[in-house]
Amino acid sequence: MLKEFKEQRLKEIQELRSMGIEPYPYKFEKELTAREIREKYDYLQAGEVLESEKLSFAGRVMSIRHHGKTAFFHMKDDTGRIQAYIKADSVGKEKMDLFKRHVKIGDFVGVRGFPFKSKTGELTIYVQEYTLLSKALRPLPEKWHGIKDKEIIYRQRYLELIVNDEAIERFKKRFKAVRVIREFLNSRGFIEVETPILHYVTGGAEARPFVTHLNVFDIDMYLRIAPELYLKRLIVGGFEKIYEIGKNFRNEGISYKHSPEFTSIEIYQAYADYNDMMDLTEELIVEVVKRTCGTLKISYQGKEIDFTPPWKRVRMRDFLKEKLGVDILEDPDEVLLKKLEEHGVELEIKNRAHLIDKLRDLVEEELVNPTFIIDHPVVISPLAKRHREDPRLTERFELIIFGREIANAFSELNDPVDQYQRFLEQAKMREEGDEEAHMMDLDFVRALEYGMPPTGGLGIGLDRLFMFITDSPTIRDVIPFPIVKPKKFEEEEAEFEGGFEE
């Protein structure tokens, strides 16, 4: 069916060109969006015509109803849909015949005319001129819910955007949230910066990196797992309030909350500590939720999340004692391992850091409203400053919402000797088979030796945050083009079914 459909459309294109009509012209002067037309002329009464008001509009044809010498058709742009009406008496018999033969669902068309409301009260453009702007060679899906395979949606996101208006709004909300974040930080004197994506040494998080090869130097390099260490180098160099929004890459699993390629923001402020960063995190996310959702109490997958400040703050040690009855500072590894086994958790790597991480995962699931888990042990926080009251702990927090880690922040470690020792401990863990442990970064230690002021640092996983504000069940729903298992083009073509009937 698809092959025959394309062949027919190609014949139509040849016919248009033989008539001197270019089916892919260069430009069209679009004056108003669908939303602007509705806002400007919605006051019209049913049957009222405003012939003195000329306007132009362009968009994709989504439906057509032919009635003899007239036709109604719906057009769509990125603000919504608008109806148009065309008749032979207005555009001429030749242009009307051309419209009937060659303007199809999926095509882009530009129209000029005036607004009126139909007898049923629908705001409509009365078409006096039209221009074919782009011919579609493929049929649109017959109905959106007819695409059963979500993998097709993720591979061909443009299809979802074409036929599902909610998808457009979902991604608009995501992009608006990014704008809100920038406005919030810029208004507070932060500078947006850029740091490398190709790294000589990975760092800033515990994760397995993607490896690539730089031919000119004949060396392996890594896609960044986090920008943290380069951002702190900028603090060493003299910047005081900086942030970076960008992509990170971790060569790990895919799940409803994990993507190998994801977007984060990292924020660093000299002369601040983790208490300041907690306040900043709360204020920033409250602003994002308020401006994108209009309320601080939102529905997510049938449950309410209340972002109203102040948010709860809980010490990790106390939390795990209360929920699991273990003391992550005093109990030996055997006790922690036994507790995990009681909960059916299996571990490949059984060092203390992994034991504590898995225990934490067990109890965080129950936290729905935003909650700061604070004061993590040193063994799981190689880049955080030791706690001022207990050197076994660090001044670190994680923000948990709906059982998911959304943010991670520290009073940054700025003691080069302590940092070097932590790297040595991480290197030992790597030698024992922990591929996610930090690599030794001697240049970063060297940078710290020049002196870094007291600094608060914060990282937020933006995709997970955007899942909440768009009520999306999986992270792939908020990433425009997520990573999916590839299929051969021919296999994808075979999966395509149907099209609008014309």
UniProtKB/Swiss-Prot annotation:
<protein>
    <recommendedName>
        <fullName>Lysine--tRNA ligase</fullName>
        <ecNumber>6.1.1.6</ecNumber>
    </recommendedName>
</protein>
<keyword id="KW-0436">Ligase</keyword>
<keyword id="KW-0067">ATP-binding</keyword>
<dbReference type="InterPro" id="IPR012340">
    <property type="entry name" value="NA-bd_OB-fold"/>
</dbReference>
<dbReference type="Pfam" id="PF01336">
    <property type="entry name" value="tRNA_anti-codon"/>
</dbReference>
<dbReference type="InterPro" id="IPR018149">
    <property type="entry name" value="Lys-tRNA-synth_II_C"/>
</dbReference>
<keyword id="KW-0479">Metal-binding</keyword>
<dbReference type="Pfam" id="PF00152">
    <property type="entry name" value="tRNA-synt_2"/>
</dbReference>
<dbReference type="GO" id="GO:0004824">
    <property type="term" value="F:lysine-tRNA ligase activity"/>
</dbReference>
<dbReference type="InterPro" id="IPR002313">
    <property type="entry name" value="Lys-tRNA-ligase_II"/>
</dbReference>
<feature type="binding site">
    <location>
        <position position="405"/>
    </location>
    <ligand>
        <name>Mg(2+) 1</name>
    </ligand>
</feature>
<keyword id="KW-0547">Nucleotide-binding</keyword>
<dbReference type="InterPro" id="IPR004365">
    <property type="entry name" value="NA-bd_OB_tRNA"/>
</dbReference>
<dbReference type="InterPro" id="IPR044136">
    <property type="entry name" value="Lys-tRNA-ligase_II_N"/>
</dbReference>
<dbReference type="InterPro" id="IPR004364">
    <property type="entry name" value="Aa-tRNA-synt_II"/>
</dbReference>
<comment type="similarity">
    <text>Belongs to the class-II aminoacyl-tRNA synthetase family.</text>
</comment>
<dbReference type="GO" id="GO:0006430">
    <property type="term" value="P:lysyl-tRNA aminoacylation"/>
</dbReference>
<feature type="binding site">
    <location>
        <position position="405"/>
    </location>
    <ligand>
        <name>Mg(2+) 2</name>
    </ligand>
</feature>
<dbReference type="InterPro" id="IPR006195">
    <property type="entry name" value="aa-tRNA-synth_II"/>
</dbReference>
<dbReference type="GO" id="GO:0005829">
    <property type="term" value="C:cytosol"/>
</dbReference>
<dbReference type="GO" id="GO:0005737">
    <property type="term" value="C:cytoplasm"/>
</dbReference>
<dbReference type="GO" id="GO:0000049">
    <property type="term" value="F:tRNA binding"/>
</dbReference>
<keyword id="KW-0460">Magnesium</keyword>
<feature type="binding site">
    <location>
        <position position="398"/>
    </location>
    <ligand>
        <name>Mg(2+) 1</name>
    </ligand>
</feature>
<keyword id="KW-0648">Protein biosynthesis</keyword>
<dbReference type="InterPro" id="IPR034762">
    <property type="entry name" value="Lys-tRNA-ligase_II_bac/euk"/>
</dbReference>
<dbReference type="InterPro" id="IPR045864">
    <property type="entry name" value="aa-tRNA-synth_II/BPL/LPL"/>
</dbReference>
<keyword id="KW-0963">Cytoplasm</keyword>
<dbReference type="GO" id="GO:0005524">
    <property type="term" value="F:ATP binding"/>
</dbReference>
<dbReference type="GO" id="GO:0000287">
    <property type="term" value="F:magnesium ion binding"/>
</dbReference>
<comment type="subunit">
    <text>Homodimer.</text>
</comment>
<keyword id="KW-0030">Aminoacyl-tRNA synthetase</keyword>
